[in-house]
Amino acid sequence: MSDLEDDETPQLSAHALAALQEFYAEQKQQIEPGEDDKYNIGIIEENWQLSQFWYSQETALQLAQEAIAAVGEGGRIACVSAPSVYQKLRELCRENFSIYIFEYDKRFAMYGEEFIFYDYNNPLDLPERIAAHSFDIVIADPPYLSEECLRKTSETVKYLTRGKILLCTGAIMEEQAAELLGVKMCTFVPRHTRNLANEFRCYVNYDSGLDCGI
């Protein structure tokens, strides 16, 4: 190749090269999030076909703090179809708590052994290592506002919990939730990153900070 051809080879400016490197770094982080980022709410995008709607940062924090207060140091927490609460819990507590995410969406398998594949249609189809009544609290957010979905999810909740239940679902499910799980509606109103058409509420079966703030 001649010197003339070398001179005519397109060269990126320092600014353009830096921008390109930043773009590639962002792409890599989305594919392979770092340890400090992998628990960020939204690191995995909502899939509306799976009826996924993430909580706002404030709501996820409130629910995570409620769970921590309810179980105490060293407690075991199950998040059933509530991935954004799991993420906030792990963001707050890297150690001293056992926290599991029960989820249909296998993208959350990035969380390793704490991910348990879960299909509410088969409510008790769980790994042998998940023993009955082995969690101090179960936080559940059934993906669909239907009696069938709540009933089947309730089977899972009752199998997992040692007693405490924190249910998040529509206000229209209040009567069914009380019948199935013995829970009562809290004054705290959860919010999502996107506004939902249906009013959403929290329900518990124990004395909760969600009625007075933590």
From Swiss-Prot:
Top-level enzyme category: transferase
Residue positions where Phosphoserine is found in the record: 2
Assigned keywords, A-Z: Acetylation, Cytoplasm, Methyltransferase, Phosphoprotein, Transferase
GO molecular function: methyltransferase activity; nucleic acid binding; protein-lysine N-methyltransferase activity
Keyword Glycosyltransferase tagged: no
Subcellular location: Cytoplasm
Organism superkingdom: Eukaryota
GO biological process terms held by the UniProt record: peptidyl-lysine methylation
Record's catalysed reaction(s): L-lysyl-[protein] + 3 S-adenosyl-L-methionine = N(6),N(6),N(6)-trimethyl-L-lysyl-[protein] + 3 S-adenosyl-L-homocysteine + 3 H(+)
Annotated Pfam families: N6-adenineMlase
GO cellular component terms, semicolon-separated: cytosol
Family matches, as InterPro entries: DNA_methylase_N6_adenine_CS, Efm5/EEF1AKMT1, Mlase_EEF1AKMT1/ZCCHC4, SAM-dependent_MTases_sf
Residues that bear N-acetylserine: 2
Similarity comment text for this entry: Belongs to the class I-like SAM-binding methyltransferase superfamily. EFM5 family.
Function noted in UniProt: Protein N-lysine methyltransferase that selectively catalyzes the trimethylation of EEF1A at 'Lys-79'.
HAMAP family found in the cross-reference section: Methyltr_EFM5 (MF_03187)
Name of the protein: EEF1A lysine methyltransferase 1
Species per Swiss-Prot/TrEMBL record: Homo sapiens
Gene designation per UniProt: EEF1AKMT1
